[in-house]
Amino acid sequence: EMLRSLVGSEMCIRDSFLDAAREAGYLEIQPPYVVNAASGYGTGQLPDKEGQMYHCNEDDLYLIPTAEVPVTNLYRDVIFNESDLPIKNTAYSACFRREAGSYGKDVRGLNRLHQFDKVEIVQIQHPDHSYEALEEMKAHVQSLVERLELPWHILRLCGGDMSFTSAITFDFEVYSAAQKRWLEVSSVSNFESYQANRLKCRYRGADKKTHLCHTLNGSALALPRIMAALLENNQTPEGIKIPKVLVPYCGFDIID
């Protein structure tokens, strides 16, 4: 019975994240889980993270490490009218990562998995507004963790910790009561024109010339670590308390 409640709770978390994204103006996309190498190069996972991606040798295809890859690649070779921007998409998907070289306590339990589920948000933006969009996306992720009543903080990453494709990245972390440390549940990044240049994702301005768009994405949020944090931080003598925001989705407020 508890296992059934736990599985149901994770689906409720997913649905609440997708509803929040739709309410924030994101159009939901159902992405493919298998992409070609060109897609990986377009968003910058290849060649940088090739060792972390699962490769299907016979077909020369890759399992997606994040929905960012197929969603952003929808706009390869697209020229938008300036008035079309911004484009805001969300997607729920499984994510696949080899996690080569990972070892020790960081790979135990739900910390680091070869397959995990995540809701992603992606924006294609006018360059003049991409940093406003970044703040909007950070506020969106902040609202998710706050509504789940989890202890959290935000970090601005230094250059050495960021993806080479990113101009700026912020990580959101929630506290693991059992492990007594912080776990990353979201990264929000502005890639400026880096991905757009690889993808030839452009818009036509008032000057009738084409210009590169800016791309942004963020996890909103990664489910396994959120689930672990909820289980660890919400234990009571009666059972595991469900955050108020999830009760309408779950139909119960305690897992006992």
Which sequence ranges carry the predicted segments?
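Single conserved hydrophobic/aromatic residue that forms the stacking wall/gate
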Residues: 1-8
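TRNA-recognition modules of translation machinery and tRNA-sensing kinases, especially anticodon-binding
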Residues: 9-10, 14-256
